[in-house]
Amino acid sequence: MGNVPAKLDQDASSYTGRSTYTDSSSASGVGAFRGAGGTMDETRARGRRTSSLVGNILNGPTSSRNDPTGEVSKKQLSAAKKRGTKERELLKEENAKKLVIKYNETVDGGYLAPHGCYSLDKMDYDSDIVRKLIIERKLAPFYIPLQDFDDSWTKDEVKKIVDALPLHAPFNEHVEEYEDVPVGDLNEPHFDYLIDKKLSKKEQKKMHALIFKARLYRKRLRWQESENNAYLEEKLQNRDNDIPKNSFLPNDDLKYDLYAQGSECPICFLYLPMPLNYSKCCQQPICSECFVQIKRSEPHFPHDEVDPSQPQKDENEKDPNLLISEPANCPYCATPNFSITYTPPTGRKVGIGGQAPNLYKPLGTAGNAPPTYTVSSDDIRPDWETKLNKERVRLARRSANATAIHVSNRLIGPQRTGSFANEDSPGVAGSTDSRSAGVANSTLEELEKQMIDEAIRLSLQDEKRKAKR
């Protein structure tokens, strides 16, 4: 939008030639139109310039910068959108793969991926960051939970119960949302052939997103089942050995030490090995699977007090820069900027960076105490600010589009009707045009100014965003 003045000059010069042609042609035609011809041509030229601004704002700043003519091939835009969609889908698949529990990725008796107490769509944290924090022992690992624990259980009873635990919680194979949704061959990367081409483009887009979600759910189920089967196979082969041959399987001492001194998470009410994470503000325990659910609010406008005597503003009329995303509050005491602290166990360092789980022996607790680490809910979702800015841009464009469409409708409707009427009735042209020319000029000048102001505002916002980066 920074090139608005140049665009206006260019349009003005090109339309001047058209005005000359109109004057010369009208001279040999209707004499009555001659007096008001210059005024009406100027009005039409201004209308075209304003319509050009409307088009620029509707098309957005990107298209006008990439293509100086303002004309971008529809095929190119469509191809770019498809590439963007495919890249986003590949990223989602990669993230889903990292949410699969693997029995050979273990830290201190827990794992790098969640057990499955919550649905996949809630696991939108940065999995690379969480995995790194667990490996560095700055966040409690994801443990396999027990529904309950009885202090009277013997070591053999605890061993049998732990041996029966599945690596991942059972999946619901019949999700209502995905019923009757075709998924096709999951080994094939493309699935557009499953979409009914008779649907509108909007409906096809919705169907594409739904099929992708259903396919991803099925793929994740398949990936996790494969890991579950491998884990079960290894356990069956080593069930009669006090010390498993597979170095990633825990021995009996580790199984007992993990669960004999556990604790219940007050949010999910599941029993898990210690130590857990603790809220920094009120020192309440919270498991990692519950912690990763807690995040900032979605971008929204501040909740101002509503004055019933004043008309309520539509979202399109509000300043997009007022959008906010409030930090997460503690689920226990509602303190803002929620963070947890974690102190790794002193006598148990197994798996990645420690002893082999099958050779576990309790370590001595003498010596320096391990450091305590702090992790905030923003640390595991560092892209919150990017999402907020994207929503601001989206709302700004939506507001600009609404303004542009409104102005365009005001320009096209009465102006074109009046022009066509004058051309069909040349005898009345002089009187009608002379009366309406002043009003038309005034209205178009006002609309042109409004569109220029809008263009400048969007350009300034764009520059501010660039400066922040």
From Swiss-Prot:
One of its GO terms (biological process) is cellular response to glucose starvation. Disulfide bonds: none annotated. Keywords: Cytoplasm. It is found in: Cytoplasm. Transmembrane segments: none annotated. Residues 11-28, 50-67, 431-441 have a biased composition (Polar residues). One of its GO terms (cellular component) is cytoplasm. Its main location: cytoplasm. InterPro entries: Sip5/DA2. Residues 1-86, 301-321, 414-441 are annotated as: Disordered. CDD domains: SIP5-like. The keyword Ribosomal protein does not apply. Residues 301-320 have a biased composition (Basic and acidic residues). Belongs to the SIP5 family. May negatively regulate the SNF1 kinase. PANTHER family: PROTEIN SIP5 (PTHR31315:SF1). This is Protein SIP5. The lineage of its organism: Eukaryota, Fungi, Dikarya, Ascomycota, Saccharomycotina. The gene is SIP5.
